[in-house]
């Protein structure tokens, strides 16, 4: 079964996208995220502890108010090099129409150089559910209850 296809409007802010580098694409048929590239003019080196805000060369507009997008790290960059998102996860509301920027943070032990056009993050579009808050005095009991961090163990 194939996934639903929804439109995502983009403005190309860097003319190298779509010519020198591909537009954001899914790496495989089953990929959930579109690969985002670093729209840099020159290589950028992140030394351990540094964080920088990088342009992806695009602006986006989701149009559909039942959708949002999240910017997520690329697993290989984080695991192999310690390069993660400086803000953990970037949440993009459907009414945002500005440039798509990515905060990269080097939490590793060695300097890491990002080349112009490198894939630096991924964009995943998700459905949202808006809720109405119900103030209650007690909750209906669940199996977990108030058990928090580490409550279920590791084994």
From Swiss-Prot:
Q: Does the keyword Magnesium apply?
A: yes
Gene Ontology molecular-function annotations: dUTP diphosphatase activity; magnesium ion binding
EC number of the protein: 3.6.1.23
Q: What does this protein do?
A: This enzyme is involved in nucleotide metabolism: it produces dUMP, the immediate precursor of thymidine nucleotides and it decreases the intracellular concentration of dUTP so that uracil cannot be incorporated into DNA.
Identify the InterPro entries for this entry. Answer: dUTPase (IPR008181), dUTPase-like (IPR029054), dUTPase-like_sf (IPR036157), dUTPase_trimeric (IPR033704)
Write down what this protein is called: Deoxyuridine 5'-triphosphate nucleotidohydrolase
Q: Which residues bind substrate?
A: 74-76, 87, 91-93
What does the UniProt keyword field contain? Answer: Hydrolase, Magnesium, Metal-binding, Nucleotide metabolism
Q: For this entry, list what GO says about its biological process.
A: dUMP biosynthetic process; dUTP catabolic process
Catalyzes what?
Answer: dUTP + H2O = dUMP + diphosphate + H(+)
CC cofactor: Mg(2+)
The organism sits in which domain of life? Bacteria
Give the species: Xylella fastidiosa (strain M12)
Please state the pathway this protein functions in, per its UniProt record: Pyrimidine metabolism; dUMP biosynthesis; dUMP from dCTP (dUTP route): step 2/2
Question: Which family is it part of?
Answer: Belongs to the dUTPase family.
Catalytic class of the enzyme: hydrolase
């Amino acid at each position: 079964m194939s996934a639903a296809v929804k439109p995502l409007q983009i403005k190309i802010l860097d003319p190298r996208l779509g010519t020198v580098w591909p537009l954001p694409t899914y790496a495989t048929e089953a990929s959930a995220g579109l690969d985002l590239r670093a729209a840099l003019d020159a290589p950028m080196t992140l030394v351990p502890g540094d964080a920088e805000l990088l342009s992806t060369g695009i602006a986006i507009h989701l149009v559909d108010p039942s959708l949002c997008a999240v910017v997520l790290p690329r697993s290989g960059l984080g695991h192999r090099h310690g390069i993660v998102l400086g803000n953990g996860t970037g949440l993009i509301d459907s009414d945002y129409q500005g440039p798509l920027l990515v905060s990269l943070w080097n939490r590793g032990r060695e300097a890491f150089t990002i080349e112009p056009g490198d894939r630096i993050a991924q964009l995943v579009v998700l459905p949202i559910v808006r809720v109405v808050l119900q103030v209650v005095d007690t909750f209906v009991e669940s199996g977990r209850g108030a058990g928090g961090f580490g409550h279920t163990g590791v084994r």
